[in-house]
Structure formats: structure tokens, C-alpha cells
Amino acid sequence: MDTFDSARESLEGYLRRIGCLNDRYRRGEIHVHVPAGLDEDAPIDDLVRRCLPDSARALDAASRSLFYSLPVAFDPAHSVGPYLATVDRDPEGEPYRFLDMGAMIATQAFGENDPRVVEALLRDLPYVTSRFAHSEYQTALSLRLKAALDRVAPKGTPRHFVVNTGAEAVENAIKAVLLNRVKTSGEASGGSIVSFEGAFHGRTLGSLAVTHRKKARLGFPTFDWPHVSFPAVDGTPRESARREERSLKQVWDLIASVRMPRAEQRRESFQRELEAIDGFLAAPGGDLDAFVRAQREALGEEPLRRARRVAAVLVEPIQGEGGVHFTSAGFMRRLRVLTRIYDVPLLFDEVQTGWGATGRLWAHEMFDLPAPPDAVIWAKKAQNGVLFVSEELATFFQEEKKFNTTWEGDSVGMVRLLAVLDRLDLDQVARTGEHARAGLEAFARDYAGLIHGVRGAGVMLGFDVVRGDWRDALRERAFRLGLVLLPAGERTLRFYPRYDTEPYVIDEAVGLLRRAIEDLIRGRNEPAVAAGPEIRVGTLECPIEAIEAVELTPARFAELESQIVAVEAERYGDASQYPPDVLRAGRRPLLQFPSAVLAGTLSNPGALGLALRDRVSGRVVAYALGSALEGHDEEGVSADPRLGENDTFYLHALATLPSIKNQVEVENLLLTRIRDQALAGSFSHLSTLIEERVHRTGPEWLRNAQVLQVVDDYLRSGIRFVYLHTEIDGAGAPVVVERRRTRR
């Protein structure tokens, strides 16, 4: 037998199979196919062992691997479009299939086993049988890719550097702007890089310095660089405008003084510059270079010299990992002019958004910037990492091989990208995105108590689930039904169809979402809105003088966890409060916080917690905990007028045993103690989403708190919650906000 006979036979079978699969997919004959038992109320790992045994064996064989997320083994050879086959087969020999609405973490523009990609890989097989070290050994393939990148390079950033991953591209962008400062301004350290809260730029050490995701950063020493608030478009236009101005002021403070002041600093100077920028942007056809020169002359040499200590501002056009958050075009235009005036490079991280995902070739094109960015970072759909830079930043790339990397990209990824680079159809992206968004908006309308905030551009879509633990539960239920979704931020689910996804596939995905959420609320009758759970006649005597307060540190919480969870369960998870079918095995109670959520809050910046314990019995009878407002994304937080000011304590969780006779008295003691704790922790304001009953029966300072939002039927529990805000230091003018009422 010829050496290649077996391979040739296998290849021919594969080509016949994918040809047939693609035909069936385009005819609408491929659908989700998962074992019926996968939806039983049992731990998912147990169900995988029972229903997907081949996947379980493959995972067991790789048990020393440090990380995997989805508990199945996929089979690329039998996958098609967004339908991912598993290695497991049904009794008829057909593979089980999951529907991927994560686009392989935003890496795939087109479907699995796309015929044109397969054809390209076969044609360029010689280039992928050996991996050339392109830093020294260029090939016709690597040079063909670099020539192709010239065609898609963003305006103003014609030079490019191919690396292996998005994080590596971010690292090289960081190095480029730091070296630029060292060489051009004599700033020995290279200065600092300003990034935004909610940002995610990678997990390598340098990229962690510009990432604002506590779980990714925790435990790693890195650069102490500043983060400013990201003015996500949310709430009223007035509120969005206030956030934008606050964020620009923070950037301006850093550029002008290289520190983040708590007090207002030279606000009149900032307002004067901002008014000048707005005036320029309002006049069509303005000469940006002339405007920048005039502003620099007015500023003088000293402010411009100080600004050199900021090496760059780095921003995502859309925060993907951070929660599919957008800001306005007006904010980005102002930011671009501000950074030009102070000669601070502006970098766009388009790792997720680049090459068509938003309906534009590059997402920053949505903003109609008065000047292009100084660098654009791309990866994901590039199948490698790519850094595009301006001619100015490219100056030092050849110096002493400071930017060298052995591989300069992976050949297989190069072939994949070249196969689809000229297939981008932005009209197709728009059509696919519009169909998906319409389906999600209808879904959100039908489940307005649980789902809201559908948003996106192109096929980069997301929606919020009312609480983070519900988001996780919904994602798991969807997975059991065969739908793969990826989380983002604190309570967002991403919905990323591929560019050429067939309409029937999107309809199927939305249908599975509907089934999944019905699983979470199945069996419930719509209850009448009540003021709160009925307070039962208590049997436990708990005199105030017999109560001791215990500060809840993470370690102390671990010691008292079982008692705290018992209080939470009796208050919000007991069958006397909810229909029994809601509490059957494998379901999460409607209002009860899982212990992992409570522990997570105590790991936040500014975390405070308190438990009240009966000295006689030693039993915890009440607890409360929370942290800085900026660490939360619950209902009402995004519209809080103090968000971004870093002076507000958010009371995240509070529960008192409903079985004690003097429940309200104990509750009020707890509320006052936690308020005092927050005041001692340098917080001047307190916000919380809390039962309306507690607002009515709480201590005077809470009864006088301003109601910012009324949430009827919270989590379809029949309980009315209110979002409260109050000043706790007794100083300052009252906050003026627009009161909202929603049915959640």
C-alpha cells in the first residue's frame, strides 16, 4: 500500500461527508440533537457520563489538564455551520450536535467545514505540514498574508505586525507606545497607559495592567496604571451625557496632572477645553491640525510636557468580555480630539470587534472620528494576532529586535484567514444581525421580568439577565437543551451568530432560549404583586442585648457560611414562600443568593459584611454584606447617579431569620450597623435594591432614602423591590434623579 493511500481514502471520505453536510445545512435539515436525558435534574457532569459516555471518557483521559469549560468533546469532522458535533453517537450512529451562538469566542466569521476554507487548506497543504519560524524564514504564504493585510488595514495605521494571539498583540502595542515615549520625550519609564473600567485586554502580565477584571488580575503583580470609568450608553440621555463628561474629566485629569484626584481639580479649565472641542466638532469641515495647534499654543509648554507621562489611552469600541457595552460616537470623537491636543496616542482594541462583526469593517468606523487612531489591535477572526500602527509608532519596530517573535503567526491560521478575507459581505452581516436582534427583542419582551437590555451592532449582540446567578442558571439550562452561549460581564449573555448563519438557525436558538427560561420558571402561576413575603409569627426570642456583631471577612464568611446560607434559604428559599415545584432538585430558588455569589461580593474592592449572632445559641440570625458600587451590575446600578464616583457602598445582600419574633428590630440594628461600617470605610453614600417592606419598616435614615426605581414582581416572585439611594455622611446637596418604575 502506498504511504498515502490510507490518508487519501480518509480525505476522500471527509470531503464527501462535508459536501453532504453543507448541502443539508443550507436546506435547513441540520438541527440541534442532544440526548433527552441531558435535561434531567442532576449535576451536568453526572449527566454527561450517562448520556455522552465517549465525551466523558475523552475528558477523563485528559483529566490532568488544568482547564476546560464545556463538559463535552467535540468532533470537528462532523460539524457544519454553527452546529458542533460531539464524539458521541445516537443509536442510529448520528452524532449529537450543539448549536454554538458564541462563534467560538468570537473567532469564527463563517461556519464549520466551510468548503472554501477546506479547499484553501488542501491547496496550501505544503505550507502547513511544517511550521516555519517566520521571524527569520518568510514563506510565500506569510508574505501573501502581509500583502493582504495592506488591503484591510484601518485608515491611519498602515503598518502591521503579525503575532500569535490577541494578548500578544496587546503586549506589543503597549511596548510600542512605551518605547515611543522613551525615545521621543525622555520619559525613562515610558509613562502609564490609561484604560477603562470593564475592559478586558488579555491575561498576559502586561495586558493585565490594562484589564479591569478582578478575577483575571487577582494575585498578579503588574503595572499600577489607572482605569477610568467607561460611559456605557444606558438610561436617560441626560444620565449618559453626565457619565461621558465624567469619564472625559477623568482622562483629562490624568493627562493634565498624571493623578486621579478625588476632589474636583480645575474644572473650569476642563470645561473651557471641552467647550472648545465641542465647538470644533459641531462645525463641519473643520481643520483638525489647525485647531490642535491653536489649543496647544493656548495651553503652553508645561501642560504638554506633563502629558508626556501618559503613553497612551487604550479603549475597546465595544466591551465584549466586559458585558457587550457601548459608548456613544460623540464620546469617542471628543476623546480622539482630546488625545490629539495633548499628543497622547489613542489605541483601539478590536480583538473581538474587528473585520466586520459590527457591520463595519472596523468597529471604530462607527464613530466617524475626526482623526484615525494611532494603533488598532486585531485577533480572533484573524486566526492570529495582528497589530496595526501608524507610521510614527512603527519607527522603532526594527530596533534591536525589540518586537521579535519566533513564529510571527501560525500558518494554518494564515490559510484560514486568506480563504475568507475577500468574502466579507457587510450587508450579509447586517441582515444576520437584524434577524437575530429581532428574535432577542421579542424574547426579552415576553420575559420582561427576567431579560432586558438587548443591544449590539451587527452580529455582536448581548442581553442582560436580571441577576448574575440567574444568568448562569439560564446558560446551563440552555446548554442542556443543546445551545452554547458565552457569558460576559456580571450578568450578560452574548449572542454571536456567524456572518452567514441561516435564519432558521437563529430562530432555533431563540426557541431554545425560550425553553430554557421556561425551565427556570416552569409551573409558576403569575402571582399578584405583594408588598413582601408574609412575616411569620416567630418563635425565637432574640433580645437586642443578647446579640453580638461579627465582622464578615472572607475568612470569617467561610467559617459561618453554612449558617449564613441557612438564613438566606429560610428567608428567600423556603417552600412556604414559593410554590414547591420551584424548589425541586436542580432548580435555584427565585430570590436566594448562592453562597458563591456572597463570597464573590466579599472579594470585591471596598467589601464590608456583618453577621448578627445570638450569644445564647451561637446561631447567626441576620447578615448583610456589600462592596463599592462600581463592583456590581444588579438591577438599577447602571442608572445610579453616583456610579463612577467611587464613594458609594452598595448593600448587595441582607437577610434576617423570619422565625424570630422581633425580626424588624433585628433588621434595623443590622442596617444601622452596616451603614456605620460603610461610613467608617470612607463611603459617603449608600445604595441598595431591597424589599419595599424593608424600606417601610427600616430605620429612619433608610425610610428617608430616595427611591430611584420601583421593581414590581422582582424575579417573578410576587415581591416588590425598590432601588434606594441615600447620603450617609450628612453633607452635600441631595441627588436629583428621574424615578423609574419597571415590572421585573
Where are these regions (language model features)?
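Conserved acyl-donor/pantetheine-binding loop and adjacent beta-alpha core of acyl/acetyltransferases
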Residues: 615-653, 715
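Conserved N-terminal entry element of GNAT/NAT acetyltransferase domains
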Residues: 530-574, 740-744
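Conserved acetyl-CoA-binding loop-helix of GNAT-fold acetyltransferases
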Residues: 653-656, 662-678
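Conserved N-terminal phosphate-binding loop of PLP-dependent enzymes in the Aspartate aminotransferase
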Residues: 1-534
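Active-site rim helix/loop that mediates acceptor-substrate recognition in acyltransferases
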Residues: 568-616, 625, 631
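Conserved GNAT acetyl-CoA-binding A-motif
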Residues: 678-693
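Conserved active-site alpha-helix within GNAT-family acetyltransferase domains
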Residues: 691-718
